[in-house]
Regions:
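Catalytic cores of large soluble enzymes that bind and process phosphate-bearing ligands
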Residues: 8-12, 19, 83-87, 119, ...
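Short, charged, solvent-exposed linker or helix-capping segments at domain edges/interfaces
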Residues: 39, 83-86, 165
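GHKL/Histidine-kinase-like ATPase module
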Residues: 53-60, 89-92, 96-99, 104-206
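Flexible glycine-/small-residue-rich
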Residues: 23-24, 31-33, 74-76, 111, ...
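Short, polar/flexible loop-turn hinges at active-site or ligand-entry regions and domain interfaces
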Residues: 4-7, 78-87, 175, 198-202
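GHKL (Bergerat-fold) ATPase N-terminal catalytic module, capturing the glycine-rich phosphate-binding loop
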Residues: 1-75, 81
Length: 206
């Protein structure tokens, strides 16, 4: 899980490039390695263009002249997905969330010629601030943040009703919760219990 390439494709927590390739009409990858550009291509999950040296991507992909990095270009297989499977709002929401999860990274979505870019300098801190702003609420105390090579945790308390708990593993949403989310929630409740007043009672459902 700690390998950079593993983190990028989502490891076992998501389909990554393998799943995308298997469900795409075509998938092309162009990448720069040690100053040289290489390309590999697939159709319907089958290799059609073995790795070969090529030139940097340009106007062909509408990304401008790239000097380094990797470009992945694919088309979802229409026999598997319908147009309704990819509403623009879903793509915009995904790009916006990825910007929060990867501070400093700019993501640009191009929908029918209209571009929209997303960037976050503060990452999860910015996300929480925007959520509080949407609720017209302010955090009651300084935001708690913890981060190391394995995890980043951000917690804020406000005077708004209810709560919002979101978890992500390698950039992929844990929509059904799971061990990662449950462990953080349990630790938070345990910490609150140690500081509660003698007449106050809390449970995991509070």
């Amino acid at each position: 899980y700690r390998l950079a390439c593993g983190v990028f494709v989502g490891n076992s927590h998501g389909v990554g490039v393998k799943g995308t390739n298997a469900t795409s009409e075509f998938l092309d990858v162009v990448s720069c390695y040690k100053g040289k550009w290489y390309k590999i291509g697939f159709k319907k999950g089958k290799l059609t263009t073995p790795v070969k040296e090529t030139t940097a991507p340009s106007d062909e992909f509408k990304v401008g002249r790239m000097k380094s990095g990797t470009l992945i270009h694919y088309k979802p297989d229409p026999t598997i997905f319908s147009v309704k499977s990819f509403p623009p709002s879903m793509l915009v929401e995904w790009a916006q969330m990825q910007a929060y999860l990867n501070p400093g990274l700019t993501l640009t979505v191009n929908i029918k010629g209209k571009q929209k870019s997303f960037f976050s300098k503060g990452g999860p801190r910015d996300y929480i601030a925007n959520q509080l702003a949407a609720l017209k609420s302010e955090a009651e105390a300084d935001l708690f943040e913890f981060s190391n090579e394995l995890a980043t945790i951000a917690v804020a308390f406000s005077n708004a009703d209810g709560f919002l708990l979101k978890g992500f593993t390698n950039g992929l949403t844990n929509s059904q919760g799971g061990k990662h989310v449950d462990s953080v929630a349990a630790a938070l409740f345990k910490a609150i219990q140690t500081h509660k007043g003698a007449k106050q009672e809390f449970s995991n459902n509070d």
